[in-house]
Amino acid sequence: MDWTWSILFLVAAATGTYSQVQLVQSGHEVKQPGASVKVSCKASGYSFTTYGMNWVPQAPGQGLEWMGWFNTYTGNPTYAQGFTGRFVFSMDTSASTAYLQISSLKAEDMAMYYCAR
């Protein structure tokens, strides 16, 4: 019976640990074509440089699309095809925050942009 409680405790402890991970993004913004926007994603509950940060836009009426990821350990970005040039991933390690900057906004950039660990 003791081993059963140990297993249950380990499962509960693991669940509690993961539930503390949070990614908090900057608020909603409306910009005009040609403008720039910088979206932030503040991480907490884990070591920021242990996991990469993915960026995933969702255009109105469309599914999620992976636009790339940022290696928070090395600082190297990887961009999916179609997301180069105007799109820049960056980070502030001391603030555990990742950023997505989009310049020269176009109508087709209209989407919700999500960060994902």
From Swiss-Prot:
The keyword Disulfide bond applies. It is found in: Secreted; Cell membrane. Residues 78-115 are annotated as: Framework-3. PROSITE patterns: IG_LIKE. Disulfide bonds join C41-C115. Residues 53-69 are annotated as: Framework-2. Keywords: Adaptive immunity, Cell membrane, Disulfide bond, Glycoprotein, Immunity, Immunoglobulin, Immunoglobulin domain, Membrane, Secreted, Signal. Pfam families: V-set. Residues 116-117 are annotated as: Complementarity-determining-3. Residues 70-77 are annotated as: Complementarity-determining-2. SUPFAM superfamilies: Immunoglobulin (SSF48726). GO terms for biological process: immunoglobulin mediated immune response. One of its GO terms (molecular function) is antigen binding. This is Probable non-functional immunoglobulin heavy variable 7-81.
